[in-house]
Amino acid sequence: MFSHKFICGSLTKMTETGITFDPPVYEQRYCATIQILEDARWKDQIKKVVEFGCAEMRFFQLMRRIETIEHIGLVDIDKSLLMRNLTSVNPLVSDYIRSRASPLKVQILQGNVADSSEELRDTDAVIAIELIEHVYDDVLAKIPVNIFGFMQPKLVVFSTPNSDFNVIFTRFNPLLPNGFRHEDHKFEWSRDEFKNWCLGIVEKYPNYMFSLTGVGNPPKEYESVGPVSQIAIFVRKDMLEMQLVNPLVSKPNIDKESIPYKLIHTVEYPFYVDTRTEKEKLWTEVQIELQRFKRQFESSEIEEGTYQDTCNMPIAFLLDRLEHVGATKERIEELLLENNLTVENECVLIVSSDQESEWSDPYKFSDRSSQDDALVDQEQEEERWDQGPES
């Protein structure tokens, strides 16, 4: 086994009427899974991710923000559920205003987690959040074959309820008639049962190691029962700089009994590759700050009823604004002189709007403030995808 520690915290409260988790357990699972995907040991090598049991595609709204991921496959067996939610993967206006730095292709697929299909080839990471407890034994037996035998990903994450925790739930309400937390659950494993399932997988597929963790910590007086939701992280040994036991199969055969996946929807996100030199990028930032300073100066002149042909922007102020992009006083002064701007007494002389300037490009910046406003609006729209109640 290997180790993985989550940095996100949580608070569990138990009162006379019930138990509450802050943040909700589904948010903790999402947070934990994002942290796993972004682990520095393998993040840059995770380009294609497949999520089985994607349901309403809530987790996708977080996963799509990882810039290193370039292909996401969202798989569920329920076609009607996919059809109701397929538009939620489309780019927002903000995705066009602030494009990604790398491409992102998203595919919504109808299929069974137990079936191998062409769309699953070359997958780097597999995510299955609260899925395995919903399948019957015959499907459960085929899941490792499809994922570890056919797909051979670098990383796999499973989460499932921890039945040891149910003793706390039954203090307040009985479990459902099927004996579980959800009417569609076919089983709920204890921590030992889940561990044994994982051990069976690495015994059959020795190229992998696993680590067990979880989210939704119990109250202090019940620490022995473990977390409400348990998580297994499988990592291919070469991701941990270890020798593979068996060579990878270059092109594994698709199981003849597998039903091919059906493509429901495909979308490609806008992206922009910045080919400018570092010097060109810095000059753009300098121009933006000069324009901003000039607008503020002219606005104050209008309010005070005073007008001047030039305004002086201290280089120290400019440096303070641009230090985060690697600006230095020497680099800024060099750029200013190269672009025919006058520097006197540690200040840049900026001409007023009614005078011609060699560095001024009114069309380049005229829509900047309106774009910023639009970006704020769309970021608020994005947030609603992260806040829905758990189903």
From Swiss-Prot:
GO terms for biological process: piRNA processing; primary piRNA processing; RNA methylation; secondary piRNA processing; siRNA processing; transposable element silencing. Mg(2+) binds at residues 130, 133-134, 185. One of its GO terms (molecular function) is metal ion binding. Binds 1 Mg(2+) ion per subunit. It is an enzyme of class 2 (transferase). Residues 374-384 have a biased composition (Acidic residues). Keywords: Magnesium, Metal-binding, Methyltransferase, RNA-binding, RNA-mediated gene silencing, S-adenosyl-L-methionine, Transferase. One of its GO terms (cellular component) is cytoplasm. InterPro entries: Hen1, SAM-dependent_MTases_sf. Methyltransferase that adds a 2'-O-methyl group at the 3'-end of selected small RNAs. Mediates 2'-O-methylation of piRNAs, single-stranded siRNAs and long hairpin RNA genes (hpRNAs). Methylation protects the 3'-end of small RNAs from tailing and trimming and could constitute a recognition signal for appropriate argonaute machineries. This is Small RNA 2'-O-methyltransferase. It comes from Drosophila melanogaster (Fruit fly). The lineage of its organism: Eukaryota, Metazoa, Ecdysozoa, Arthropoda, Hexapoda.
